[in-house]
């Protein structure tokens, strides 16, 4: 059985993420979408909330499961018996950063990284940009799954109420 891990912060999951996950799922028997935990960053959503949103958003992909991990991604991949990491690339800046990570991961563990070019429809899309635009009232409804969009608007409203 071939498997891959598809890591990210997914804060929140976007349609761009889902495009890459779906395309990876078409290539591998199993894809583990892994929410990487960075304790130095305070996300808009908790890790548990991100997992819930990912599980809901990928429920129609039977060979996809969702998990989280704190530590080196290659350690997780080895623990799961996974030999490939899948990363989406939006452009040259992503490639420059991700290539160095891929080479380091390969050196540390022998785990290879496969790059999937992002669908041009989503090449501008990032979770950070979506959050920023939504915070200022911009319409991001076509950039996220419907339920994720609703949760994003609710969380932004909560944060606004807390700060006023």
UniProtKB/Swiss-Prot annotation:
Please give one Pfam family short name. Answer: CTP_transf_like
Annotated membrane-spanning segments are none
Q: Describe which pathway this protein belongs to, using the record's wording.
A: Cofactor biosynthesis; coenzyme A biosynthesis; CoA from (R)-pantothenate: step 4/5
The compartments listed are: Cytoplasm
EC number assigned by the record: 2.7.7.3
Give site residues, Transition state stabilizer: 17
Instruction: Look up the coiled coil feature and give its residue ranges.
Output: none
Q: Which GO terms describe its cellular component?
A: cytoplasm
Q: What class of enzyme is it?
A: transferase
The reaction(s) annotated as catalysed by this protein in its Swiss-Prot or TrEMBL entry are: (R)-4'-phosphopantetheine + ATP + H(+) = 3'-dephospho-CoA + diphosphate
Q: Which InterPro entries match?
A: Cyt_trans-like, PPAT, Rossmann-like_a/b/a_fold
Q: What is its main location?
A: cytoplasm
> What Gene Ontology terms for biological process does this UniProt record contain?
coenzyme A biosynthetic process
Residues that bind substrate: 9, 41, 73, 87
Gene Ontology MF, one: ATP binding
Listed cofactors: Mg(2+)
**Keyword line:** ATP-binding, Coenzyme A biosynthesis, Cytoplasm, Magnesium, Nucleotide-binding, Nucleotidyltransferase, Transferase
Q: Any idea which positions bind ATP?
A: 9-10, 17, 88-90, 98, 122-128
List, alphabetically, the NCBIfam families matched: coaD_prev_kdtB (TIGR01510), cyt_tran_rel (TIGR00125)
HAMAP family this protein is in?
PPAT_bact
Question: What does the similarity note say?
Answer: Belongs to the bacterial CoaD family.
Subunit and partners = Homohexamer.
Query: What does the record give as the function of this protein?
Result: Reversibly transfers an adenylyl group from ATP to 4'-phosphopantetheine, yielding dephospho-CoA (dPCoA) and pyrophosphate.
Please report the name of this protein according to its UniProt entry: Phosphopantetheine adenylyltransferase
This chain's source organism reads Rhodococcus jostii (strain RHA1)
Task: List the top taxonomic levels of the source.
Answer: Bacteria, Bacillati, Actinomycetota, Actinomycetes, Mycobacteriales
């Amino acid at each position: 059985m071939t498997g891959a891990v598809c890591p990210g912060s997914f804060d929140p999951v976007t349609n761009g993420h889902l495009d890459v996950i779906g395309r990876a799922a078409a290539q591998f028997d199993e894809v583990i979408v892994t929410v990487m935990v960075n304790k130095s960053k305070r996300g808009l959503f908790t890790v548990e909330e991100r997992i819930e949103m990912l599980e809901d958003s990928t429920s129609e992909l039977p060979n996809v499961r969702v998990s989280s991990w704190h530590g080196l991604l290659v350690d997780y991949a080895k623990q799961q018996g996974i030999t490939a990491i899948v990363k989406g690339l939006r452009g040259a800046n992503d490639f420059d950063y991700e290539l160095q990570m891929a080479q380091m991961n390969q050196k540390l563990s022998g785990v290879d990284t496969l790059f999937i070019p992002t669908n041009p429809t989503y090449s501008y899309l990032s979770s950070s940009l979506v959050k920023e635009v939504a915070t200022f009232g911009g319409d991001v409804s076509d950039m996220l799954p419907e339920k994720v969009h609703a949760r994003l608007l609710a969380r932004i409203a909560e944060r606004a109420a807390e700060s006023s």
